[in-house]
Amino acid sequence: MKLLVGRTYSDPEVQEELKRFAYKTSALKNGGVGINIMYNDEEVVIPVEHVMAMMLTKARDVVNGANGNAGVADVVLAVPANFTDAQKRGVLRACEIASLNCLKVANETTAIALSYGIFKSAKKLFSETEKTNVMFVDLGYTTYSVTVVEFMQEHMKVLSTVVEEGLGGRDYDKAVVDFCVEEFKSKCK
């Protein structure tokens, strides 16, 4: 779903992605992507940002319920490192619709690095004078991302981020399934 946010229906990458979907989609009047649903026995098209907002609302409600209804209004979201400005704006629109104040949209691998750095720095495990470079790898469902970060005590600097689109966990799953199918075919002629 997140790969569709902030993109146009006519985008060739979106069209390729939609081939994998089990539900019906449509182009919106503004060119965006809509999800077709049945509501009160009528087909309705909902913008993908609204669907994402529904998911964020549910997440907020679950967190509130687990925390004695303490109330969550602020959120920091991690998105793939290759997200465009339009995609990030789509995520921000979804937050707005869900009545969440998005403080930051961060790259997923940078968010991982930040978490790692805070933990290690709090335990004083970084040198005050020598730099330590750490590589963070995210094999997501649809992309493969690598970020290299330089750390010193109470210091973090992202050196580089590389993203390979179209190489993710689902591609490995497909390769394994294809291999098993071919093995089965060759042994069961």
Task: Describe each model-derived feature in a short phrase.
Residues 2-16, 24-28, 40-49, 54, ...:
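Oxyanion-binding/catalytic loops of NTP- or PPi-dependent enzymes
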Residues 21:
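Internal, Lys/Arg-enriched amphipathic helical interaction segments that engage polyanionic partners
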Residues 32-38:
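Short polybasic amphipathic segments
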